[in-house]
C-alpha cells in the first residue's frame, strides 16, 4: 500500500519541481499573458501579472498550496531516503517551492505554510527526548514556544526570498544589455510585489466576505438540501438576483459555505461528522506516535491539514475537480486506515 503512495508522492514532487522552474523563469523574464474567456469571471492569467506570480497556474493560490504539500513530501524523503542525489534534489525542490510561494502573493499559501509548520513542529518537539521527560504542562509550553520560533524564522526566510528575488529580473536585463552591474544604485530596480487588489486600503478579504454572506443567503433560502453544487450560482441569479453571487459568477471561496449553499444542513451535518472523525483519528495518532519525522502518516496528516486550511479561503476540497481535491481525498483514505488498531500500535 505504501508503494502506491510513494509513486504518487514522487510524481507530484517531480511535476511541481518543473512547474516551479517554469514559473520562476516567467518571473525572471517578466513574462505574462491574460486571455479573456466567456465562461470565466476572471480572464485566464499565466506568468507574472498584477505584481504577483501566477506562473503555470491560472490561480496561484491553488499552485502555491500544493507547493506546501510538496515541501512536506520532500522533507519526508530527506528524512527517510539515503540516496544523496535524491536528497539533493528534494532540498533544491524545497527552495524552489519556497521561492514560488514568496512570489505568488498568495496569502492563503503563506497562512497554510506557517500553520502546518507550527503544527508539525509542535508534535516533533512534543515527542523529542529533551521535552518528553518534562511534566505535561511544561511539555506543551515548550512545544508551543518551539513552534512559534520556527514559524517566525520561516516567515523571515520567505520575506528575505521575496526581497532578494525582486531584484533578479533587473539584473538579467542589465546583463542582456551589457550594462555595468557595479552601479547598482542607478541601474538596479526592484520588481513591485505589492498586490494592487488588496493593498492601498482595498478589500482585505478580496471579496470573500461578500461571497460568504451571499452563500448564507442561498443557504437560508434552501436550508435543508441546498441548491446543488452545479446549480447554486444559477440559483442565486434566478432566486436571489440582488445577492453578491446573484450579481456575479463567483464561487464561495470557502468549503464550509460551499457545502451550506450546495447541500444545505443535511450535507453539512454528514460532512461535519465525517471530518470530526478524521480529526480524532489524526490527533490520536500524532499524540500517540513518536519518531514522527520518519513516519509517512505524519506528512499525510499535515498535507490534509494544509489543503483543509486553504479550503477556508479558496474553493477547494469538496464538490470540485482540482489537484488539491485529488490529493486530500487520496490522503484521507490513508488516514482512515489508521483506525485499524494494528496501524495505531506500530
Please name every model-derived segment.
Residues 35-37, 165-168, 341-346:
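Short, Lys/Arg-enriched, Gly/Pro-containing loop segments at transmembrane-helix junctions
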Residues 288:
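Short, surface-exposed polybasic-aromatic patches that bind anionic ligands, especially phosphate groups
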Residues 21, 27-30, 121-199, 213-221, ...:
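A membrane-periplasm/extracellular boundary helix in multi-pass inner-membrane enzymes
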Residues 3-7, 81-84, 133, 249-262, ...:
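Juxtamembrane loop-transmembrane helix junctions in multi-pass integral membrane proteins
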Residues 41, 47, 196-263:
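Long extracytoplasmic/lumenal interhelical loops at the membrane interface
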Residues 54-67, 252-255, 260-264, 317-328:
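Membrane-interface micro-motifs in multi-pass membrane enzymes
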Residues 6-44, 48, 55-130, 134-142, ...:
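Alpha-helical transmembrane segments of multi-pass inner-membrane proteins
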Residues 113-121, 297-346:
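Transmembrane alpha-helices of multi-pass inner-membrane enzymes
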Amino acid at each position: 500500500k505504501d508503494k502506491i503512495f510513494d509513486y504518487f508522492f514522487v510524481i507530484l514532487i517531480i511535476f511541481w519541481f518543473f512547474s516551479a522552474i517554469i514559473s520562476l523563469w516567467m518571473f525572471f523574464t517578466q513574462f505574462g499573458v491574460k486571455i479573456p474567456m466567456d465562461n470565466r469571471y476572471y480572464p485566464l492569467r499565466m506568468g507574472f501579472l498584477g505584481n504577483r506570480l501566477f506562473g503555470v497556474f491560472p490561480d496561484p493560490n491553488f499552485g502555491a498550496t500544493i507547493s506546501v504539500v510538496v515541501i512536506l513530501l520532500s522533507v519526508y524523503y530527506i528524512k527517510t531516503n539515503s540516496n544523496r542525489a535524491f536528497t539533493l534534489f528534494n532540498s533544491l525542490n524545497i527552495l524552489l517551492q519556497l521561492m514560488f510561494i514568496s512570489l505568488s502573493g498568495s496569502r492563503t499559501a503563506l497562512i497554510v505554510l506557517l500553520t502546518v509548520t507550527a503544527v508539525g513542529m509542535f508534535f516533533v518537539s512534543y515527542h523529542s527526548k529533551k521535552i518528553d521527560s518534562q511534566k505535561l504542562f511544561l511539555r506543551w509550553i515548550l512545544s508551543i514556544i518551539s513552534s512559534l520560533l520556527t514559524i517566525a524564522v520561516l516567515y523571515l526566510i520567505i520575506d528575505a526570498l521575496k526581497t532578494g528575488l525582486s531584484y533578479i529580473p533587473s539584473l538579467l536585463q542589465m546583463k542582456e544589455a551589457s550594462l555595468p552591474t557595479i552601479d547598482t544604485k542607478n541601474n538596479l530596480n526592484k520588481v513591485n510585489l505589492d498586490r494592487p487588489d488588496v493593498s492601498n486600503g482595498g478589500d482585505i478579504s478580496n471579496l470573500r466576505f461578500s461571497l460568504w454572506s451571499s452563500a448564507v443567503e442561498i443557504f437560508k433560502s434552501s436550508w435543508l438540501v441546498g441548491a446543488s453544487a452545479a446549480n447554486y450560482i444559477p440559483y442565486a441569479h434566478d432566486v436571489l438576483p440582488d445577492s453578491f453571487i446573484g450579481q456575479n459568477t463567483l464561487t464561495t471561496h470557502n468549503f464550509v459555505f460551499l457545502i451550506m449553499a450546495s447541500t444545505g444542513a443535511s450535507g453539512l451535518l454528514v460532512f461535519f461528522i465525517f471530518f470530526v472523525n478524521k480529526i480524532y483519528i489524526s490527533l490520536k495518532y500524532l499524540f500517540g506516535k513518536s519518531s514522527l519525522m520518519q513516519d509517512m502518516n505524519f506528512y499525510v496528516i499535515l498535507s490534509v491539514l494544509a489543503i483543509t486550511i486553504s479550503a477556508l479561503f479558496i474553493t477547494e476540497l469538496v464538490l470540485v475537480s482540482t489537484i488539491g481535491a485529488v490529493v486530500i481525498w487520496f490522503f484521507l483514505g490513508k488516514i482512515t486506515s489508521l483506525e485499524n488498531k494494528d496501524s495505531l500500535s506500530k
